[in-house]
């Protein structure tokens, strides 16, 4: 029995609050089963005062989205000098900003798709690049706000300039990469297995594919050639290190095996989902680590100055 006091941060106030509550509850239950003393913290604006009162030995960060994975909560934890899981201030901020993460990845020699950054309000009737392309909010996760513009669309979808848009004005317009959706977790500086994600009844791995039961199938190990499998693992570690990640991360890729075999890195996630059936815990289990053991590793890896 560990006896350490772990505060599990969950919820928060981003659009990914429901996802975070699910991750946090699963982690808290598993950590209690591992012998830790756990405090469940539904994060509000007073989180610094709450943590100062709780005085935990370690914070397990199960937050998703802005505030929880953009360097903000990490900065608060550094100020409070409480060791925490996952990446630190700089890596979290870089990874949350898809445009900046892409610049860093490209500079490290990681293959990325052509893209441009623009204000979504500048979209008119003309396409900013030749379709097909993908429009992504620069600072959102869980595929919130992602729009695929197909070849047969004569002008950009109106939803992008709509007053109902809730995902920020800065967007990335990225060349659409056909092919298979592949992802690889990294634990420390070691690649886990490669998983293929097959959305069920969805055009891509959107919110419902990720979080609705039966929304997607996960195939691990991915049924791809050994050299592509190993290349994905190598690129995932390279991205993890280039961006400065700590603990665990997950890199997403597209692989077009129908043509020239183009393999493209899409993005890195410093706060991947943490339920037992989430992608990275599945990868850890494939490597021989049960969910509780995996979380124990993350807690023991926690530190400040990450």
Curated annotation (Swiss-Prot):
Per the record's keyword annotation, is Zinc included, yes or no? no
* Root EC class: ligase
Cofactor binding mode, per the note? Answer: Binds 2 magnesium or manganese ions per subunit.
- Superkingdom per UniProt: Bacteria
Sites where the protein binds Mg(2+) 1:
252, 267
Print the keywords alphabetically: ATP-binding, Cell shape, Cell wall biogenesis/degradation, Cytoplasm, Ligase, Magnesium, Manganese, Metal-binding, Nucleotide-binding, Peptidoglycan synthesis
Which cofactors go with this protein? Answer: Mg(2+); Mn(2+)
User: Domain named ATP-grasp: which ranges?
Assistant: 102-300
Task: List ligand-binding residues for ATP.
Answer: 128-183
**Gene Ontology biological-process entries:** cell wall organization; peptidoglycan biosynthetic process; regulation of cell shape
Q: What EC numbers are recorded for this enzyme? A: 6.3.2.4
The main location is cytoplasm
State a single Gene Ontology molecular function. Answer: metal ion binding
**Family matches, as PROSITE patterns:** ATP_GRASP (PS50975), DALA_DALA_LIGASE_1 (PS00843), DALA_DALA_LIGASE_2 (PS00844)
Q: Which Pfam families is this protein grouped with?
A: Dala_Dala_lig_C, Dala_Dala_lig_N
Give the pathway annotation.
Answer: Cell wall biogenesis; peptidoglycan biosynthesis
Keyword ATP-binding assigned:
yes
Name the GO cellular-component terms: cytoplasm
Reaction equations catalysed: 2 D-alanine + ATP = D-alanyl-D-alanine + ADP + phosphate + H(+)
* Localization of this protein: Cytoplasm
Residues given in the record as Mg(2+) 2 binding sites: 267, 269
Q: Which NCBIfam families match?
A: D_ala_D_alaTIGR, PRK01372.1
Family that this chain belongs to: Belongs to the D-alanine--D-alanine ligase family.
This chain's function reads: Cell wall formation.
Q: What is this protein's name?
A: D-alanine--D-alanine ligase
Which source organism does the UniProt entry give? Sinorhizobium fredii (strain NBRC 101917 / NGR234)
Its lineage opens with: Bacteria, Pseudomonadati, Pseudomonadota, Alphaproteobacteria, Hyphomicrobiales
Gene encoding it?
Answer: ddl
């Amino acid at each position: 029995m560990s006896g350490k006091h772990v505060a599990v941060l969950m919820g928060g106030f981003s659009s990914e609050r429901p996802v975070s509550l699910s991750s946090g509850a699963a982690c808290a239950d598993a950590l209690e089963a591992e012998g830790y003393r756990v405090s469940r913290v539904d994060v509000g604006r007073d989180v610094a005062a709450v943590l100062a009162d709780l005085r935990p030995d370690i914070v397990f960060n199960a937050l998703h989205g802005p505030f929880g994975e953009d360097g903000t909560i990490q900065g608060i934890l550094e100020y409070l000098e409480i060791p925490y899981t996952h990446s630190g201030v700089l890596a979290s901020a870089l990874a949350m900003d898809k445009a900046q993460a892409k610049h860093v990845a490209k500079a490290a020699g990681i293959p990325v798709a052509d893209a441009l950054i623009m204000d979504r309000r500048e979209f008119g009737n003309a396409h900013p690049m030749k379709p097909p392309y993908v429009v992504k909010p620069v600072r959102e996760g869980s595929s919130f706000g992602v729009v695929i513009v197909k070849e047969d669309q004569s002008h950009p979808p109106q939803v992008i300039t709509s007053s109902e848009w809730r995902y920020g004005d800065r967007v990335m317009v990225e060349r659409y990469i056909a092919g298979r959706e592949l992802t690889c977790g990294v634990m420390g500086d070691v690649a886990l297995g490669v998983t293929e994600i097959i959305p069920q009844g969805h055009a891509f791995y959107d919110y419902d594919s990720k979080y609705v039961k039966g929304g997607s199938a996960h195939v691990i190990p991915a049924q791809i050639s050994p050299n592509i499998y190993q290349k994905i693992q190598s690129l995932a570690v390279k991205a993890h290190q280039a961006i400065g990640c700590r603990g665990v991360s997950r890199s997403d890729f597209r692989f077009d095996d129908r043509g020239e075999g183009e393999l493209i890195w899409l993005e890195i996630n410093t706060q991947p989902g943490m339920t037992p059936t989430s992608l990275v815990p599945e990868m850890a289990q494939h490597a021989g680590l049960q969910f509780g053991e995996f979380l124990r590793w993350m807690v023991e890896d926690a530190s400040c100055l990450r």
